[in-house]
């Protein structure tokens, strides 16, 4: 009897703990859902807003990228095409490369993702018509850097193999100084001849918090059902005999 009672108390403790734990996780996921919806709304407003001047160079060291990312910005300067970097990419056009080119501005140097090129246009000599000289105005989305590379594919600067837009590493490999801690995803712009295709930024945030919350609450409900079964008094033998 004592052993059975101890087992029952253990099951009660487990069900109670599960109810509290799974319920707390469900509430946490609802909070994350509210945060994600707010984030999506704020980013959507930034993406569709008129472009604003790029953050001044004096603010770069303290720039809050969470607040600045995906803002539409505008920068004026000239490109250093001889220092461009090709980063592996897969887009709606298939596999290819992002063309990352330093833009020298009055505020400092900003890396610009000018757009996508297919494998046959990796050589810059084949797209000379898309290499603007002199002062240009670039508009696009401010993006946070992508340090290190991708999962299982680390950047290898020594081999000119780039799998992510790692601002600091690209700047170091190209000998650039006073570089912004962000890059700009350039908008699409009409140019003559073969050129990088801009405006391919995909703004998408996975939002599965509601399904996660429902899962946790369902598990909490199962634990509650277990509690009910455990605390419900067992049927008396005479009552069971009568029913039989």
Residue ranges and their predicted role:
Residues 1-244:
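Surface-exposed, charge/polar-rich loops and edge strands
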């Amino acid at each position: 009897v004592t052993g059975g009672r101890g087992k029952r108390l253990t099951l009660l403790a487990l069900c109670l703990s599960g109810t509290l734990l799974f319920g707390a996780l469900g509430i946490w996921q609802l909070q994350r859902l509210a945060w994600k919806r707010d984030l999506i709304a704020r980013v959507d407003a930034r993406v569709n807003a008129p472009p604003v001047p790029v953050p001044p160079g004096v603010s770069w060291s303290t720039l809050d990228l969470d607040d600045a990312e995906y803002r539409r910005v505008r920068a004026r300067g000239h490109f250093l095409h001889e220092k461009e970097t090709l980063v592996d990419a897969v887009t709606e056009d298939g596999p290819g490369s992002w063309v990352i080119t330093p833009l020298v501005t009055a505020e400092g140097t900003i890396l610009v993702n000018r757009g996508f090129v297919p494998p046959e246009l990796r050589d810059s000599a084949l797209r000379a018509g898309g290499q603007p000289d002199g002062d240009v105005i670039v508009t696009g989305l401010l993006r946070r850097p992508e340090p290190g590379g991708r999962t299982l594919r680390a950047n290898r600067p020594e081999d000119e193999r780039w799998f992510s837009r790692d601002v600091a590493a690209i700047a170091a490999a190209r000998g650039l100084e006073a570089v912004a801690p962000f890059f700009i995803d350039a908008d699409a712009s009409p140019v003559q001849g073969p050129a990088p295709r801009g405006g391919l930024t995909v703004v998408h945030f996975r939002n599965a918090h509601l399904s996660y919350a429902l899962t946790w609450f369902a598990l909490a409900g199962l634990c509650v059902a277990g509690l009910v079964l455990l605390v419900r008094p067992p049927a008396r033998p005479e009552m069971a005999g009568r029913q039989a």
